[in-house]
Amino acid sequence: MEELPQSSDFRSIVLNNTPLIDVRAPVEFAKGAFPHAVNLPLMNDEERHVVGIKYKEEGNAEAVKLGHALVSGDVKEARIKAWTDFIASHPDAMLYCFRGGQRSQIAQEWLAENGREIVRLKGGYKAFRNWLMQETEKAVEQFKPIVLGGRTGSGKTILLKKLQNAIDLEGLANHRGSSFGRDITPQPTLIDFENALAYDLIQKLDQGFEHLVFEDEGKCVGRIYLPKILVEHLSEAPLVVLETPTEKRIEITFDEYVAKAHEKYKEVYHADYLKVWTEDMHEAMKRIQKRLGGQRYKIVCEIFEDALKEQKKNSSLEGYKVWIAYLLSEYYDPMYDYQIERNASRILFRGNAQEIEAFLKEYR
């Protein structure tokens, strides 16, 4: 059979959001893959496991023979159909395995035999992943960062989403960055996060942005650690501080952490949604117990319980606004004010959302 096409034009894959078929086993895919990749494995986890044992005991030739025996007949036809169905709806798709070796080559050959030509990634997952990590390091040197700060609930994420030159780290990490910031769906793996961040940086720089705006974060978002080189770059960046009245901040926080959260929990947990949400909120309060101190922790729990009783009695969520107001004034605001005071020399501009949006459009 003639040589089948390969590509190492990873930049084009990123800029075009090229759909990818990952033919690795599910256990490998779960550890980390690329944006726009779908896992349609050549071998499932069990098949990969026994082939791996055969490889260690008897070498490559016997392992390949066993692999072909395991993935044959109806099993083989089903795997090929899964690939051809995906290619039919994504004609620009490419495929890869771990190193661009036998698995992706076999899949590519089987597809060619069925009249479907597809390009495979040269060097596979490993080569593309290494390239993305190198590009992240290069990218950090190519833009001037601006950090968007502001007290909790000031609407930083809302503003960030309006800016074309923003990198939404919390969105990529699927976490709102606070003790109460866990989403109902799990965070991505660190590898998935790093790959998605690399895509975002490469695409933004390709659009010609000189400045990129990031929300003020620490070294991690939830359990996702940010790349050290990025953390260091942002730590010296100029700060733009979003100022929002307290009442508005309470409304924004209530909308995100209570009203919308309830809807999300209902979709997943149905009749048990309130029980699960309540348990999650108690866990979140426990996470800040030490910093709050005994007395304030007792008060915040009592306010929450009062709000919960009101909800159960009157179907009203209004009591949670008192809870949010207490958390803001007694926990989040003092903590943020201390941090912003330490970084006062970095403050470039202060204003409301409209003023900051206008300022950033003109800033050079």
UniProtKB/Swiss-Prot annotation:
Q: What class of enzyme is it?
A: transferase
Alphabetically list the UniProt keywords: Selenium, Transferase
InterPro entries in the cross-refs: P-loop_NTPase (IPR027417), Rhodanese-like_dom (IPR001763), Rhodanese-like_dom_sf (IPR036873), SelU (IPR017582)
- Molecular function terms, GO-annotated: tRNA 2-selenouridine synthase activity
PROSITE patterns in UniProt: RHODANESE_3
* Catalytic reaction annotation: 5-methylaminomethyl-2-thiouridine(34) in tRNA + selenophosphate + (2E)-geranyl diphosphate + H2O + H(+) = 5-methylaminomethyl-2-selenouridine(34) in tRNA + (2E)-thiogeraniol + phosphate + diphosphate; 5-methylaminomethyl-2-thiouridine(34) in tRNA + (2E)-geranyl diphosphate = 5-methylaminomethyl-S-(2E)-geranyl-thiouridine(34) in tRNA + diphosphate; 5-methylaminomethyl-S-(2E)-geranyl-thiouridine(34) in tRNA + selenophosphate + H(+) = 5-methylaminomethyl-2-(Se-phospho)selenouridine(34) in tRNA + (2E)-thiogeraniol; 5-methylaminomethyl-2-(Se-phospho)selenouridine(34) in tRNA + H2O = 5-methylaminomethyl-2-selenouridine(34) in tRNA + phosphate
- Which GO terms fall under biological process for this protein? tRNA wobble uridine modification
**SUPFAM superfamilies named among the record's database cross-references:** P-loop containing nucleoside triphosphate hydrolases, Rhodanese/Cell cycle control phosphatase
Query: Which residue numbers delimit the Rhodanese domain?
Result: 14-136
Query: At the top level of its lineage, which domain of life is listed?
Result: Bacteria
The record places the active site at 97
Q: Which SMART domains match?
A: RHOD (SM00450)
Pfam families reported in the protein's UniProt record: Rhodanese (PF00581)
Asked if the record carries the keyword Translocase, the reply is no
EC?
2.9.1.3
Keyword Amino-acid biosynthesis annotated: no
The record describes its quaternary structure and partners as: Monomer.
Regarding protein family, the annotation reads: Belongs to the SelU family.
What is the stated purpose of this protein? Answer: Involved in the post-transcriptional modification of the uridine at the wobble position (U34) of tRNA(Lys), tRNA(Glu) and tRNA(Gln). Catalyzes the conversion of 2-thiouridine (S2U-RNA) to 2-selenouridine (Se2U-RNA). Acts in a two-step process involving geranylation of 2-thiouridine (S2U) to S-geranyl-2-thiouridine (geS2U) and subsequent selenation of the latter derivative to 2-selenouridine (Se2U) in the tRNA chain.
Provide the protein name. tRNA 2-selenouridine synthase
> Source species, please?
Sulfurovum sp. (strain NBC37-1)
